[in-house]
A protein has these predicted regions:
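Extracellular carbohydrate-recognition regions
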Residues: 198-240
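Short carbohydrate-recognition loop motifs
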Residues: 231-277
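Beta-strand/beta-sandwich contexts
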Residues: 21-67, 114-153, 185, 194-215
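C-terminal motif of bacterial Sec signal peptides marking the signal peptidase cleavage site
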Residues: 16-19
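Extracellular beta-strand ligand-recognition surfaces/modules
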Residues: 297-298, 314-319, 356, 374-422
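Extracellular carbohydrate recognition and processing domains
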Residues: 332-395
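Beta-strand acidic-aromatic groove motif in beta-rich domains, primarily in extracellular
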Residues: 306-331
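Extra-cytoplasmic beta-strand recognition segments
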Residues: 213-215, 282-313, 379, 428
Length: 434
């Protein structure tokens, strides 16, 4: 009898719960049959109709029989449905955050039976980002490649002093544009349906110019070797620095050949105390206080007839404590004891090895040239962390570390193929890159 009473109590409790559910939640979600229809789409937080939305934006579908929706896709990306936000006439949903593999500009709605209804709606990618330009010192009329992310056409690109140029084709990571006549130095602007982006880099950037090999007061050779500074029919503008020669071989180990492959700028005159009148500190030309957010940039031309196949381009920075152009152990006008001219800071023989970046683009394919055209090379100063053999350098970099620059194609901890590279360099500069 007690057991029967207990069972009746449980049954009554269940009936009461069911009744409460029916009474208290009359709009509780129930999957329906048939196909949905959408009348329009609006923002979730305001009654404004829209035909497109950004990724991860919350929107509201308005229509009929929306409770029949079992699966929902924007293009080919599935949306996460929450039945708490679905009624017969409205459905609140967040646009998927991933880029579609195929952009169809449609919403796909499947019911439980797998039947399909569609609605035209465009998902916008995130706002564009511009990160690079294949040749920052290109002339008007030349075609360059702009790189970045979310660079989806249709878009426009604007150079200072010119009207925007329409771009109709882009895969999202890069596009090509012909620089318009009248383009002035400065940052470029890219506009897509998702927003506007301005480059950190500048077209024809002359900020922080260390060497242009043309005009004073920018210095040139100031070390043990006077490398070739010349011009020819390939010149970007005026003179350039040349390392290597068709008749000079760089062996497979990138063996030491400073006579042909080392450019040195070591500041300091032969005075006591050492002055910098004729050979200034490179910190006179660029502010390195934010060096972690800066990069060394230059234009590079390597002809296809003389590709580069061995050795690393060692981009070496050093303060006056490691190298200067004057005498050793002599005070300078700022009270520093100068190191004098030497190559020990390069090899680490008898002195701390100076920090450097190792530019080795040939290692990915075994050979590198620039396709008989100039390109811009960007090497962040945060990558100046190596020794000559590719091991990690422990020298503490400070803003005053950047008073000199040595470019030496040598070693780098890689083995390649003997070659006769011709390496042309112009417009070496220290600029912000992020």
């Amino acid at each position: 009898m007690k057991a029967m009473t207990r069972n009746i109590s449980i049954l009554l409790s269940l009936l009461l719960v069911a009744a409460c559910t029916t009474w208290d939640y009359p709009d509780r979600f129930k999957q329906t049959e048939g196909l949905p229809t959408i009348d329009y789409v609006r923002y979730a937080d305001r009654d404004v109709a829209i035909t497109q939305a950004a990724m991860e934006e919350v929107i509201c579908l308005v229509g009929e029989n929306l409770t029949s929706i079992h699966d929902l896709y924007f293009n080919d990306q599935a949306a996460v449905l929450n039945t708490s936000f679905i009624t017969e006439h409205t459905l609140v949903v967040s646009v998927p955050k991933n880029l579609p593999l195929e952009q169809t500009d449609k919403i796909y709605m499947y019911n439980k039976a797998g039947d399909l209804a569609t609605y035209d709606f465009k998902v916008l990618p995130p706002a564009p980002k511009v990160t690079g330009m294949s040749l920052e010192w290109a002339q008007p009329g030349e075609t360059v490649t702009i790189t970045g992310s979310y660079l989806f056409a249709p878009l426009t690109v604007e150079f200072p002093g010119c009207d925007p140029v329409a771009i109709s084709s882009s895969d999202g990571s890069f596009f090509e544009v012909t620089i318009p006549e009248g383009a002035q130095p400065g940052k470029i602007k890219v506009t897509t349906e998702s927003g506007v982006a301005q480059s950190v880099f500048m077209y024809k950037d002359s900020r922080g110019m260390l060497f242009n090999f043309d005009t004073d007061p920018h210095p040139a050779n100031h070390g043990w070797h006077a490398q070739v500074i010349e011009t020819d029919e390939t010149a970007l503008s005026g003179n350039f620095l040349r390392l290597g020669d068709p008749g000079v071989t760089l062996d497979e180990e990138g063996g030491w050949n400073d006579a042909n492959f080392s450019f040195e700028y070591w500041p300091g005159d032969w005075d006591e105390p050492v002055t910098y009148t004729d050979s200034p500190l490179l910190t006179s030309y660029a502010d390195f206080s934010e060096w972690k957010n800066m990069a060394l940039k230059f234009e590079l031309f390597i002809p296809s007839s003389n590709p580069w196949k061995s050795g690393a381009m060692q981009l070496i920075v050093a303060g006056v404590d490691l190298v200067t152009g004057g005498g050793a152990d002599v005070p300078d006008i700022y009270g520093n004891i100068t190191a004098g001219a030497n190559n020990m800071f390069i090899s680490g023989s008898g002195k701390p090895m100076a920090p450097r970046a190792l530019f080795r683009p040939w290692t990915s394919t075994g050979s590198y040239d620039t396709g008989d055209k100039w390109v811009t090379v960007t090497v962040p100063y945060s990558e100046f962390i190596y020794n000559s053999d590719g091991t990690v350098n422990t020298y503490e970099i400070k803003p005053e570390t950047f008073t000199s620059l040595t470019i030496f194609v040598w070693s780098g901890g890689v083995t390649g193929t003997a070659c006769n590279p011709v390496i042309k360099i112009d417009n070496i500069r220290a600029v912000p890159y992020k």
